[in-house]
Amino acid sequence: MTAQGNKPSSHDVITGRWTPSAADRAAGRVSGFGVITNIINGGLDC
């Protein structure tokens, strides 16, 4: 639940504390399940 590198905290995304930057929006990253899926990527996170 802690931000790691260039990934925001999944808790912050879920609770609405994270807001996408202009670069995030340009890359298609907006608040919601899709961003959570990208944060929890099955690597060391799982």
UniProtKB/Swiss-Prot annotation:
Catalytic activity: Random endo-hydrolysis of N-acetyl-beta-D-glucosaminide (1->4)-beta-linkages in chitin and chitodextrins
UniProt EC number: 3.2.1.14
Superkingdom field: Eukaryota
GO molecular function: chitin binding; endochitinase activity
InterPro entries registered for this protein in UniProt: Glyco_hydro_19_cat, Lysozyme-like_dom_sf
Keywords: Carbohydrate metabolism, Chitin degradation, Chitin-binding, Glycosidase, Hydrolase, Plant defense, Polysaccharide degradation
Biological process, per Gene Ontology: cell wall macromolecule catabolic process; chitin catabolic process; defense response; polysaccharide catabolic process
Group of enzyme by EC: hydrolase
Expression triggers: By yeast extract and dilution. Slight induction by glucan elicitor.
Role according to the record: Defense against chitin-containing fungal and bacterial pathogens.
Family from the record: Belongs to the glycosyl hydrolase 19 family. Chitinase class I subfamily.
Protein name, as recorded: Endochitinase 1A
Lineage of origin: Eukaryota, Viridiplantae, Streptophyta, Embryophyta, Tracheophyta
